[in-house]
Amino acid sequence: MKTFSLAKFSLALLLLSLPFNFILTDGVGSVYLSTILIFLNFLIVVFFSKGQLIFKKEAFIAICVFIYFLLFTILNVLVSKGFLLKEQLIFSVIHLQLILVFLLGNYYSNYISKEVLFKFLFFVILLFSFRIFIDDWDKVFNLSSVRGFRVETIFAGGVNNFGLIVGLGFIISFFHLKKGMLKVISCLYFIIVIILTMSRGALFGLVITLFLVALYDSKGKILSSLLKTSFFLTVIGFIVLLYSNAAQDIALQFSERFLSIFSGETTIEQASSGRGLIVRDMYNNHIKNSSILEILFGHGMGSINYMVNGSPYESSHNFIVDVFYRNGILILLGYLALVIYLCFMFFKNRKGADLTLFGFFVFLHFEILVNPYVYAAQTGWIYGLFLAIFLNQNRLGHYKRKKIILE
């Protein structure tokens, strides 16, 4: 098998786990098809590439980081005499699959062009979004008003994660596809699907992404394209909703989810789904009681599991707070340094950077502040894939290298 074909096959296998994901078995926790495919994928690439996947500087660092996570997770389990053992084990697997996909993404970056990557992603995200209509057609217009109500909770890890993946499809449509009906139709389709999910994070994230990419674009073409496309999408969307039987329900739910805060019907606390309350509870009842070692090295990968207002939570719904509590302040500082480095590389390469990739970067990192999708067993691994691609895109001197994915 040729190396180039291996990379394409592996990427296709990885991405297709998104639309076709399901629970294989229940044991200590739910085992998803995507998790099995990630481990299988990794072993296949290691074998056929003769170890190229792991013999890289980035791979060595990533493996060391996971070993660091694992050591302090085991230490916390031993000190607590097995407390949260099941949760620590589950989230250790989630962290491991994130690391493995990062290693795979680092390998892909040498052999797959951005054109191939975007085509694969676009096709897979279409299939991913179609599944909600195929599996749960009678509930599509119920707008995910009840937690756990719709099928995307099973294969995507929740409504917000579903909206996140669909948002990536919109970014490809808007920034990568050439002018024409395909671009207009796909943009309109993805926006309508996001509105149906009522994911505020995904919708606001796209608005912020479009605005920041327009500012980032040194040629100034995105702003004019944004205004034109927005106008056509608004007109077409209005016509579709006007002649849709669900128009009234959509307008009512949209008003309640997105506009009620401005009318005073909803408080900021309610609009944020209680995120402020969760963080305050976490600080007052958990972080304040932490030892210096726990602050430095964390409480373990699966250490967040507590009740707030009678509801169970496995995340603070803020990735920065989660990393600090799970992995410690040292890892948090390292992660923030990595994000700052990526920002610096994007702006250093501004004239030649790909706007679609920058759109991914902005969107994923806005979402990570309000939606802890990284910790979803079904879809969180996608952050590892993009993190590897961002690192290869922004490496110094990447324009002179022949095998970098984004040349």
Role assignments for model-derived ranges:
Residues K2, I36-L53, G167-H176, F211, ...:
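Hydrophobic, aromatic-rich transmembrane alpha-helices
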Residues L241-D281:
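Flexible juxtamembrane loops connecting transmembrane helices in multi-pass membrane enzymes
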Residues G51, A59-F60, G180-L182, L215, ...:
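Hydrophobic transmembrane alpha-helices and their immediate junctions
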Residues F141-N142, F155, T266-N327:
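Long extracytoplasmic/lumenal interhelical loops at the membrane interface
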Residues M1-K50, Y68-S80, L364:
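N-terminal signal-anchor transmembrane segment
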Residues F39, T356-E367, V374-E407:
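Transmembrane alpha-helices of multi-pass inner-membrane enzymes
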Residues A59-L71, G82-Y107, V116, F120-I125, ...:
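Aromatic-anchored transmembrane helix interface
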Residues E115-N142, G157-D217:
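Alpha-helical transmembrane segments of multi-pass inner-membrane proteins
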